Each structure stands twice: as structure tokens, then as C-alpha cells.
């Protein structure tokens, strides 16, 4: 498959299933049969496309459209080792560093490819429902933690410039992060570039206690560091929280753990933090560990309701594929 040639520049940014929020319909469900066709597309988030090494398109359930992923960790290095992660870190991966010029060229070409509609003529995206045939964002995520990239601020600024050159100011720039590195100066500069270019931070928070955090994330980074970083970031701008809950060895998170999760959200708000949305979701692709399974749609809905009632924060549900058949979750 060939991508369009790079255009002259003018002088002028981490699961599948269908979303629901408070029982209300969303665009992905509004088209009946079309909403059913979207499921296979949502479940395959390949991080390669054509001959690209760093930039890849996905149909994102949380974005309600096409998201252009920017993979800053092609070597699969991550400072978390989450039990539910879809990235296979057991295989020896090729050591590849980010080639800035190659990334710039790929993003430039992919923006043209999506905005022209050519992407929807490919076999991978030809079944995309009409309502989702739109570029929603450029997302910095990929096979590891993007903020560990040493030139993080530079890459954010450069991608913002490319987005502006394509007059794609309506497209967001989304950082999907575990928030572990937000305290570093060059990362804070990158977050400020996001603020100036229709940016949004989606930070992971999936535990209420240190014990559960260590069980799920498997990292030496202290839970308190993550909480402090999220609090500081949320004081500076409203952020989105991503919270994935699952069954571990057949057991969903306890009521006590979920209550502690709500307490952490309330503590962040009490310290001046602002939330746009809490995304509550579950496992939708093959996890790292076989003892990890999705919770049911009902269980996801109950967590959404708990967040709304206990915290007064908007929350949205994203379900696992086939999870309606699950039972026994609280």
C-alpha cells in the first residue's frame, strides 16, 4: 500500500469495544448495523501501517473517529509492566530509536491520507461508519511510556507545527500516559506545548491503594509519585483519567478498592485538580497475563455510577468485546 507523497509545507496538536455514558447513546451506536461493524476495527490496534515505523492510524473507540498514533517507544521499553497490557514484552524486539525526520515525514503523509479520505478506500478502513470518518486526534502512545522519550518536548512542538501546516487545528493532540514522568522539566515543557495546541492529557489511574497499584502496574515507581504528578498536571489544566478494571484470577476489584479509587479522585480535586472525564473501561484485547479477564458491561456501568455519585465527575463506560456474557462481577 502506498501513501501519498509528502506535500509542500506552508507557513502556518493505550482496548476496543463501544462506549456508553450514563446510559445515553453515542454516535458509534447511532447507526445500528454500522455500529456493529465498528467492533472488529476497534479490536485491532496495529502499530504499523504500510511501511511506516512510527505513525499509524486506528479507529479509536474513545475518540469517536480516526486517531493517528505516534509510537515513541518502538523498542517496547516501558517503565510499567502492566498485567493487562497488550504489548508482548517477552519477545526480543528490534532496538530502534526514533528517527525524527522519518516520524515527521510519516505524520505529514498520514495527515494528508486521512484528511483527503483516501484511508477509507483501504481494506482496513473501508467499513468505517460514516459518523466516524473523521480525524479526531494525534495520539502519543504506542508500545511504551511516551514521556520517557528524551526529546519529548521537541517532538510535541514539531508535531504541533505539522498539524498547523495541514490546517488541522480542530484535531486534538492527545498524550496517553502513566503520569510517572510528569515531574521532569522537559516533559512539563511538552505538556505546555500540548496546552497551546488543542492538547489533552489522558493519565492512567487504576488503583486506590498502593497494594493494588503494585499488583496491576508492576513497577518500582511509587504510587505516591504518580498521584502527585497527576495532581500537579490537573491543577494546571483539566485532564482525562483512564481507569481500566479487570478480573484477576477470576476476581473483580473489591468494593474497598473501588472506594479507595474514588477517594484518590476526590483528594486530587480537593488539592485543586480538575477532571474533564473519567474513562472507565476493561480488557478488550489479549492481555499480558492469562489470569486477566474483562469485567462485565454491568460491572463497568456500576463503576461509572460510583464515580459519578461519590465524586461528582463525568464518567464514561467502554466495554470489553463479548463481555455481556460474563457474570459474577460486582
PLM region spans:
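Auxiliary Fe-S-binding modules of radical SAM enzymes
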Residues: 1-63, 104, 115, 250-330
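Terminal low-complexity, intrinsically disordered regions
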Residues: 23-25, 36, 73-76, 86, ...
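N-terminal pre-triad scaffold of radical SAM enzymes
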Residues: 52-88, 127-130, 136-140
Amino acid at each position: 500500500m502506498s501513501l501519498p507523497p509528502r506535500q509542500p509545507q506552508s507557513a502556518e496538536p493505550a482496548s476496543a469495544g463501544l462506549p456508553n455514558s450514563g446510559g445515553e447513546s453515542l454516535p458509534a451506536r447511532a447507526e445500528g448495523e454500522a455500529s456493529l461493524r465498528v467492533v472488529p476495527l476497534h479490536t485491532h490496534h496495529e502499530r504499523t501501517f504500510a511501511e511506516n515505523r512510527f505513525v499509524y492510524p486506528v479507529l479509536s473507540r474513545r475518540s469517536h473517529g480516526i486517531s493517528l498514533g505516534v509510537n515513541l517507544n518502538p523498542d517496547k521499553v516501558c517503565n510499567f509492566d502492566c498485567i493487562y497490557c497488550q504489548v508482548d514484552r517477552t519477545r526480543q524486539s528490534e532496538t530502534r530509536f526514533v528517527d525524527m525526520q522519518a516520524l515527521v515525514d510519516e505524520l505529514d503523509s498520514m495527515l494528508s491520507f486521512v484528511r483527503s479520505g483516501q484511508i477509507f478506500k483501504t481494506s482496513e478502513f473501508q467499513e468505517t461508519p460514516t459518523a466516524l470518518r473523521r480525524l479526531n486526534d494525534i495520539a502519543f502512545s504506542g508500545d511504551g511510556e511516551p514521556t520517557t522519550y528524551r526529546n519529548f518536548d521537541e517532538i510535541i512542538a514539531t508535531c504541533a507545527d505539522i498539524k498547523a501546516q495541514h490546517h488541522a487545528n480542530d484535531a486534538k493532540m492527545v498524550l496517553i500516559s502513566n503520569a510517572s514522568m510528569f515531574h521532569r522539566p522537559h516533559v512539563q515543557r511538552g505538556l505546555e506545548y500540548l496546552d497551546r495546541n488543542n492538547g489533552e492529557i489522558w493519565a492512567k489511574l487504576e488503583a486506590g491503594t498502593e497494594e493494588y497499584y503494585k499488583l496491576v502496574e508492576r513497577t518500582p515507581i511509587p504510587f505516591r509519585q504518580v498521584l502527585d504528578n497527576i495532581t500537579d498536571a490537573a491543577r494546571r489544566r483539566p485532564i482525562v483519567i483512564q481507569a481500566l478494571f479487570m478480573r484477576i484470577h477470576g476476581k473483580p476489584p473489591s468494593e474497598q478498592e473501588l472506594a479507595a479509587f474514588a477517594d484518590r479522585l476526590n483528594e486530587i480535586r480537593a488539592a485543586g485538580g480538575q477532571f474533564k472525564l473519567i474513562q472507565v473501561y476493561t480488557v478488550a484485547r489479549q492481555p499480558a497475563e492469562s489470569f486477566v479477564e474483562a469485567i462485565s458491561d454491568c460491572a463497568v456501568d456500576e463503576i461509572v455510577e460510583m464515580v459519578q455519585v461519590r465524586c461528582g465527575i463525568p464518567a464514561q463506560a467502554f466495554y470489553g468485546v463479548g463481555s455481556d456474557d460474563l457474570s459474577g462481577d460486582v
